[in-house]
Amino acid sequence: MSSNDPGQPEYLGSDAVPDEPKGPRRGRRTGVVVGVAVATVAAVGAGAYGVAQLMAGGESPASAVPAGAIAYVSVDLDPSAGQKIEAIEILRKFPSLRSELDISSRDDLRRTVFESIQKSGDCKSLDYADDVEPWIGNRVALAALPATEGSADEKVKPLLALQVSDQDEARTGIRAIQKCAGDDEKLGIAASGDYVLLSEKQADADAMATAAESAALADDADFTKWMDRTGDSGIITMYAAKEAAGIAVDLAGQTDRDSGDLEPGSSGSRRGKQVEAALRGFEGAAGVIRFNDGAVEAEFSSKGLSKGMGGADGEQGPDVATLPATTAAVLSVALQDGWLDEGMETFRSMMGEDFDASLARAEQRTGLKLPEDVETLLGDGLSISVDSSLDVEGLKRSPDPRKVPAGIRITGDAAEITAVIDKLKAAAGPQADVVQVRSKGDVVSVGLDKAYVDTLLESGDLGDSAAFSTVIPEAGRASAVLFVDFDAGNGWAERLAAGQDPEAKADVKPLDALGVSSWEDGDQVQHAMLRLTTD
């Protein structure tokens, strides 16, 4: 992947802006800012899928946002002509989307979205051609900047950066939208290059424009570092600075305090403590959604997030690439030592004394030692897979679980794992005899279809398939994988959809493969990717 251009759109930042003198809170104004943001993002987002004019130009919203923003998200209609073509070609493959978005036309979908909002009853007095089209641009970003120290009533200040072609027309149009929404309070509006900046107060908007002129987010070292880590630019870009963790903890705590969901016997917030634990080492994050080489792709990177069940220190998960080439779907995850401890503490904090009592009853019923036997059972990691030879119609006619080619492959101490399985089968009684268990080396396979369970012990060549390698690019070091091959076994997905309505069947036909994976690189940066390819 090529490195990302720092001038591309992104998410939220951290340069403080001055407060106005304290006065009455203006919650309604916050609603208008958010409302305008949502409407604009919706319009631009829809346009990103359908606009067919391929000229690009202008700077990204990050050039109009002050450096150090703590969070930022942007939508870009002009990432590149290539991505626009990819988006149109991919979405045209799905009949329902082609019909819904009218992708075959060259209409301005921003008009379509605006007029659909009007149909809901808002701003019917406005005309798109007269009040919006003359000034609206192709890029927009929503950002959060930290409030100045000592501001008791707010932690962040919202900022909407909207690309415009005419500053005066934009101000007039925005005021008209605000008026038709029934808000008499004036939004803060300021100019910053090709953008208008909207915030709750005029002083904030002016200060943000001045700050961006002095130091823009697009040139911020942390911002560009995270954009580089996330790969090529795209239509939607997201960014969270290190400082965003503290805001997230505060918001989670405030939510609990508002709802009364506090730690028993204390004023501490349960959710706040959980979020704080998850973000304790957080150093930043970024994400991009793009259209690339016939695929829809979302890529994310972060550092310092709690890894929970994911592989720690670059730990690789089970070798999914050695599953049978006929695999239709698989979910795989690596489990680090002590992975269950965090979950146990969470449940204990939620259930209190009832948790330990429930655990004791479960031990008595199953003969297991909990939670130790659960960790032993799942080993170092496991994969759950189903083969494309699954005969759905046959099962409908004659249900027999022994003919379901699905199973679990566990990696770890085979003797210890099978011992726990034996305990579970003994507790379940004779009906558990249908469960097939096999082991070979450090692999244990479990399922109902004897032939498939045996197959799971062999080394397959799923990793050699183009469908797999295209959507799981880092299979060799992935700690978690979800893979679906829609074309496996002569198109099992189409066969499954055969009984659905014609449009649903037609929408399944273009699907090729879906991959979701996560891994950690040598710098301990955590990566995640979702990729959906089409035929």
For every predicted segment, state its role.
Residues 3-4, 72-73, 118-234, 371, ...:
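Single conserved position on a long alpha-helix in the C-terminal lobe of the eukaryotic protein kinase
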Residues 456, 460-535:
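Long, C-terminal catalytic modules of enzymes
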